[in-house]
């Protein structure tokens, strides 16, 4: 497909995504067809989509800047740092939390295949194979009842687990840990860009993270051209509100036990 076709699809998807987020973009929809013949026109339309205001009838409070997020938090929740546990107790809990997330990834990974099912579908497959309630990793019999299987099933089903198979839920936690180990709490977006380029294969990330990593790589090819990493997340990135932001946050909670406000600030950054 031509670059104009690809860009046109991205801008159309971006417009629809911003509509779902409550932005007033309907007046821009007729411009899609007019802009389709020019990459410059599509890029200009994308900028207008980004700058569109929130609809006046949007019923949700969803601030974008950190201080507004903090101001919208439940005022009854503690934000200041406190130490109620010893270093040894904290270490044990953080280790347990991380290893539990690894085990959970292994447990769910064989089932992560379209069409995606919910708890009732999982229950039905487990009951059909005589394995409900679940007390172990997914078996071949349960996958057969499920009717589809993730390609990783050969390394994540019962009797085949020899290591933790690569998974983005685990990878982003490790990336966050490495970032803090290497750069401390004052890390920058540039530090994160460099870390991702050095450690994160593009095929092991999805959606908006893949888009950002692709742009990070392209920036390396043209170091003399300016770039705005803040813009990467919110422009020409129609999957920007997929679940990646949630699975990237764990490491900052682990790194700031007893200090939820600092953890939130690091995760926001």
Report the location of each language-model feature.
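Structured, active/binding-site neighborhoods that engage oxygen-rich ligands
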Residues: 1-269
């Amino acid at each position: 497909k031509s670059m104009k076709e690809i860009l046109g699809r991205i801008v159309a998807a971006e417009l629809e995504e911003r509509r779902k987020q409550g932005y007033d973009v309907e007046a821009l929809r007729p411009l899609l067809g007019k802009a389709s013949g020019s990459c410059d026109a599509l890029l200009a339309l994308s900028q207008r989509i980004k700058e569109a205001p929130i609809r006046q009838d949007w019923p949700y409070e969803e601030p974008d800047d950190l201080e507004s997020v903090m101001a919208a938090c439940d005022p009854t929740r503690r934000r200041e740092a406190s130490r109620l546990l010893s270093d040894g107790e904290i270490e044990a809990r953080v280790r347990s939390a991380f290893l539990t997330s690894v085990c959970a990834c292994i447990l769910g990974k064989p089932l992560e295949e379209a069409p995606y099912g919910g708890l009732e579908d999982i229950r039905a497959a487990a009951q059909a194979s005589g394995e409900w309630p679940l007390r172990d990793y997914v078996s071949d019999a349960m996958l057969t009842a499920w009717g589809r299987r993730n390609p990783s099933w050969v390394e994540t089903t019962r009797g085949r687990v020899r290591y933790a198979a690569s998974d983005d839920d685990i990878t982003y936690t490790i990336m966050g840990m490495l970032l803090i180990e290497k750069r401390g709490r004052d890390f920058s977006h540039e530090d994160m860009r460099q870390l991702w380029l050095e450690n994160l294969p593009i095929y092991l990330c999805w959606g908006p993270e893949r888009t950002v990593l692709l742009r990070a790589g392209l920036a390396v090819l043209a170091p003399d051209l300016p770039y705005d990493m803040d813009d990467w997340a919110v422009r020409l990135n129609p999957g920007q509100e997929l679940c990646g932001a949630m699975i990237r946050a764990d490491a900052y909670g682990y790194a700031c036990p007893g200090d939820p406000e600092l953890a939130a600030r690091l995760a926001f950054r």
